[in-house]
Amino acid sequence: MFFSALFVSCDSDDDDQLVEVVAPATYEFLREGVSTVSFSGQTTRLNQADAIFNALNSKADDGSGATKFYTEAQIDAMFADGSGIMNAALNGTGKKIRSKTSAGCAAGNSATQAQFDDQIADFVANVVPAWTADASSGVPGKLTDATRSIHVNGMGHEIDQTFIKGLIGGMCLDQIVNNYIQPCQMDSGTRRDDNTNGILSSGKNYTDMEHKWDEAFGYLYGQVDNAKTTDLSTNLSSTGTTLFKYLTKIEGSNDPGIAKRIFDAFKLGRAAIVAGAYDVRDAQANILKIQLSKVIGYKSVDYLEGYMSKMSAGNTADAFHALSEGYGFIMSLQFTNDGNDAPYFTKAEVDAMLSKLSNFWTVNNSDLTSMVSQIKSKMSI
C-alpha cells in the first residue's frame, strides 16, 4: 500500500507546529472505526442522468434497451423533479438534476439551465415524430451510414449526446470545481471552526466540511463499485455515462497519469480536512480544478477532430454523432476552472462557438480547426 504525505506548519501561541498530512491508499476515512464518507446523493443524480440519456434516445430509462417514447412533460419531470423514472429508487429522493446544473456557488449561471430544457423540448417536438423518416438538411429524422444510425433534429444534432455531454460540465464538473471544493461551500458559516473542533453534522459521523468534499468526490466516482476502498487511479471501471467515463478515456489516450493526479488530490485534500490543514486542502482543490477541466478540453478537441475525419471518410451519421458529442463538451467549457476560479472559456465565448456549430449540415471545417487551436492553446493540452 502506498501513501502520500505533506508536512505543513500551523501557527500556535507558543511556536510553529509541524503537522503531517497523510493520504491513505484509498478514499477510506474512518472515525472510531466507522466510515465518514458519504456521497449517495451524487450516485442518485448520476443514475438519474443515465435515465434521461436513455429517454432522449427513445429507450426505456431503466437501461433495458427497449424502445419507449416519452413526452416532454415526462422527461422534464426526470430532469427538474427527479420523478417518473422507471427505477423506483431514483424517484422521490429529493435529488434533482436541474437545480444542480450551472449552480456552483462560485460561478452559478441559472440561465444555462434553459439550454437543457430547450434540448428536451426539441427532441420531443421534432425528433420523435420523425423517428422512422429519413433525415436531411433542415429535416429531422434517421441518418444512416456504413457505421451507425442516429436520430437527429433538423440541424443534425443528436440530442441525447448534446444533452449528456453538456451535463458533464454543467452538473458534474461545475458541482466539483465551482461548488463543493470552493471556500463558499467548504468554509461557509461555521464550517471551518466546526471542522477544526471536530463538531459533527447533526446525527452524522462526519463534519460538514468533510461531507462537502465527499460530495465533490461523488460527482466523479459515484458510480464506481466500492469507490471508497478501491485504488481509483487504476480501477477505471464504471457503468455511467458522465465525467468518470471520459476521465478513463483520457487516461488511456491523451494524458496517461491524469487519473492518479486527480485521485491523489482527492485523497490528500480529504486527509488535509481531517488534519485541519486548510492550505493543503486548497492546494489539492486547485489541482482538481485544472486536471478535471482538462478532461473537457481534451474531449472537445477529440470530437471536433473526429468529426472532420469521419466526414472525410464519407460517414455522415458517424460524423454528426461525433460533432454532437463535441457540441456538448463545448457547452461544458464554460464550467471549467483554470485554478484561479475563472473558466478557460466564458459563457459568451462558448455561445459564440456554439453559434458556429448550430447547423451541422453547413458547418465550416475552418471554424472547427480554429476552435481546436483555441482550446489547445488556452488549456495547454
Segments predicted by a language model, with ranges:
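Bacterial signal peptide processing site
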Residues: 11-14
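C-terminal motif of bacterial Sec signal peptides marking the signal peptidase cleavage site
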Residues: 5-9
